[in-house]
Amino acid sequence: MTDTKTETTALSSDATEVRRQKLALLREQIGDVYPAHFHRTLSNAELAEKYADIEADVETGDTVTVAGRVYSSRNSGMFMDIHDASGKVQIFSHKDTTPEAARNLLPMIDIGDIIGVTGKVRRTKRGELTINAEEITMLTKSLLPMPEKWHGVSDIELRYRKRHLDILANEDSKLRFLQRSKILSGIRRFMEAEGFLEVETPMLQTVYGGATADPFKTFHNTLKMDMYLRIAPELFLKRTLVSGLSDKVFEINRNFRNEGVSTRHNPEFTMMECYWAYADYEDIMGLVERLFETLAIALHGTTEVEFQGQTISFKGPFKRVPMPDAVKEATGIDFLAIKTDEEARAAAKAAGFAVEKDWTWGECLAFIFEEKVEATLIQPSHVTHFPKDISPFAKEVPGEPRLVERFESYCNAWEVGNAFSELNDPEEQRRRMVEQLEQAHARGEKDKQLDDEFLDAIDQGMPPAGGLGIGVDRLIMLLTNAPSIRDVILFPARRNKAD
């Protein structure tokens, strides 16, 4: 290689242009600046583990090959820190130990470049594990400057738009996404240990259902038909339960809802949904508690988790409270003593709540719960006995036909889980779904259709079952101390830059 010192003095002062000029020089001098393959003998973490016991100011004589991105460079490249996904190692280049060809490459290396290094392992007098460079290989020339390492990417929107920079510069962000992966793996292991079979159901559906939400609509050119990104996998998972493939099934996958964006809502989000034959919602409560406790211990070694300045305990059993009782305690309104929709609306208005003129008894109850009770549910809690009006897939509570065996799990005032004793009476299921369809059409949801294939499956006979859906992103927020859902989704929904 020719000497590059004099050539680099004439480079442009613009940082990006300097890098492009260096790239051009490197192409002339070494040819391929982006080689297809590089063999390293150890990751940086493996290197640190293997040589953890060597003392300061000791040279091992062992030759290793590592690779990583340059995060810092001092004394004209004499000292460089390179990072791979597992950690960092210091690289030392000196005329006494580093051949001229390798030293001549140093002026061409910028922060952010990815290099490979072969050399002898030693520990410095200050105790830093170091490789004395004997060969340096340019693996990737970065054409853009790195974010300032010690301050990271402080612009919140930029962090979401350019997540690669966020993770490159912010150790907290990197750790959070590593934890996300660990949580997802933990959910799978837990469900499999509980005897559940993981299945996959359609993301593209001809009839959307299983939840009340606006779908994303598309068109299949070959089949010449409208299709929808699923809003929930529920109806297909129940059809799987009918099939007898397994008495316990679950799915971890994306749902899509064409609705608002907030710190707790993203149009594309991850759910874990499961169905357990011959179980009811009481069994599912226990399942939720065991799952949350298992994940907290796996991630933090304890059930006590810090979230935004408060301690949340995931130690079961969680508090359980029927919705009518919670509303009565918060407002004094005894919904169980109210007999008609008109009386419910009048009681709500008398207490200062703005309810719609056509709302039912159950809709009034649920609305007041959301307004007055949700915000108080900081520690993990199960809210039970939901109104049947808003729960078309759940069994009635014996002796109280206006309520159903449904619960939602709350934490930090957020709903993180929703579960039923699943309705399996085919005639009652059809009646409720027809009623739900009529209500949707009255709201102007003309695309909403009756899922006849699901109803046919229920006619075949579905065993009694408990069903559960968990908002995985919100659960990850709680377990990783993330204030926004966009902090735990690698590439969250955002407006176009021009907007």
Swiss-Prot record:
<dbReference type="GO" id="GO:0004824">
    <property type="term" value="F:lysine-tRNA ligase activity"/>
</dbReference>
<keyword id="KW-0963">Cytoplasm</keyword>
<dbReference type="InterPro" id="IPR045864">
    <property type="entry name" value="aa-tRNA-synth_II/BPL/LPL"/>
</dbReference>
<keyword id="KW-0648">Protein biosynthesis</keyword>
<dbReference type="GO" id="GO:0000049">
    <property type="term" value="F:tRNA binding"/>
</dbReference>
<keyword id="KW-0460">Magnesium</keyword>
<keyword id="KW-0067">ATP-binding</keyword>
<feature type="binding site">
    <location>
        <position position="415"/>
    </location>
    <ligand>
        <name>Mg(2+) 1</name>
    </ligand>
</feature>
<comment type="subunit">
    <text>Homodimer.</text>
</comment>
<protein>
    <recommendedName>
        <fullName>Lysine--tRNA ligase</fullName>
        <ecNumber>6.1.1.6</ecNumber>
    </recommendedName>
</protein>
<keyword id="KW-0436">Ligase</keyword>
<dbReference type="InterPro" id="IPR004365">
    <property type="entry name" value="NA-bd_OB_tRNA"/>
</dbReference>
<keyword id="KW-0030">Aminoacyl-tRNA synthetase</keyword>
<dbReference type="GO" id="GO:0006430">
    <property type="term" value="P:lysyl-tRNA aminoacylation"/>
</dbReference>
<dbReference type="GO" id="GO:0005524">
    <property type="term" value="F:ATP binding"/>
</dbReference>
<keyword id="KW-0479">Metal-binding</keyword>
<dbReference type="Pfam" id="PF00152">
    <property type="entry name" value="tRNA-synt_2"/>
</dbReference>
<dbReference type="Pfam" id="PF01336">
    <property type="entry name" value="tRNA_anti-codon"/>
</dbReference>
<comment type="similarity">
    <text>Belongs to the class-II aminoacyl-tRNA synthetase family.</text>
</comment>
<dbReference type="InterPro" id="IPR004364">
    <property type="entry name" value="Aa-tRNA-synt_II"/>
</dbReference>
<feature type="binding site">
    <location>
        <position position="408"/>
    </location>
    <ligand>
        <name>Mg(2+) 1</name>
    </ligand>
</feature>
<dbReference type="InterPro" id="IPR044136">
    <property type="entry name" value="Lys-tRNA-ligase_II_N"/>
</dbReference>
<dbReference type="InterPro" id="IPR002313">
    <property type="entry name" value="Lys-tRNA-ligase_II"/>
</dbReference>
<dbReference type="InterPro" id="IPR012340">
    <property type="entry name" value="NA-bd_OB-fold"/>
</dbReference>
<keyword id="KW-0547">Nucleotide-binding</keyword>
<dbReference type="InterPro" id="IPR006195">
    <property type="entry name" value="aa-tRNA-synth_II"/>
</dbReference>
<dbReference type="GO" id="GO:0005829">
    <property type="term" value="C:cytosol"/>
</dbReference>
<feature type="binding site">
    <location>
        <position position="415"/>
    </location>
    <ligand>
        <name>Mg(2+) 2</name>
    </ligand>
</feature>
<dbReference type="GO" id="GO:0000287">
    <property type="term" value="F:magnesium ion binding"/>
</dbReference>
<dbReference type="InterPro" id="IPR018149">
    <property type="entry name" value="Lys-tRNA-synth_II_C"/>
</dbReference>
